[in-house]
């Protein structure tokens, strides 16, 4: 891929661009909103992990996150170090009864594993005793609603999106009728839970794709922003979970066009973003900082000296040019550049034989008013597109949480 026009390809030698600014409050929820760049440069919260400072190994292994509640776990929950996304396809002749049976089993199994308890469907129960903050979050792809005869109950924004500009989507990382997002502080806990869910689905749903990601492991100091594989700070700008702004962005509420079963749910857009790291390594510091719109070392928006300062979108350099270039990622991802559109972002790094990058997760009550408009803007002109390419994309409706005795998706299946 080519580098941005203003980029020089020498290593080092450049003075860092002038500091820049964006206040934590006003920038919360902006950075990284949208395209490949949104996840990679502006901030995918989970790309850095969320381990508490000073936790011992025994405490980490025994930690439990409640499975039952008004919302599914794994959304508002602080993102742990390990994650796996497992997508399944339903057979063409799948019945509503078959889907309901599978979801009953998955719900029961996931609830037990989250508590560190054994379950009759767990093929390796000896691995269940250390959940390590395990969460399992289930989602429904767009075709599921057709399969069960409830097309009219599909939430807005749950669709197979066509490729955006610069996307090179591959079937092996895209689509799916069902999703299990499995997260924990320990990779054994994650893999064990994923394998148990796959085993329980046999004969009712077939594995479509599976991708694993990682962030910082337990021990990263609380309150610090970590970095993705490009060296950029990731996670600076999300709204704080539990706040009114966060709730409005994430949780579906009753209103026109919102199916009753979906109230209390949300939508996950999962994008696999490959990083073209060699050109990024070769780019100068000035090119990197002007591509993102932030200082590489501090994470401060150009023109400020504070990572959480307001992004000075109107600030100019002495020669009259914009302090933050018109094609910089933070400018194009900023809500002020997108009529206020925002999303909650999480992400995990990946590295395998095919390359390295980020598994980016955009979370919105309605992706048509958050992810989609921002993604479209970034896809059209973000300099970060010179270094990143989305190779996978899928959208899933996440049902609300359940009480003991209920199963995930029951309000839809029995609607």
Can you name each region flagged by the protein language model?
Residues 3-4, 21, 26-47, 52-415:
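Long, histidine/aromatic-enriched segments associated with O2/redox biology
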Residues 1-22:
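N-terminal secretory signal peptides
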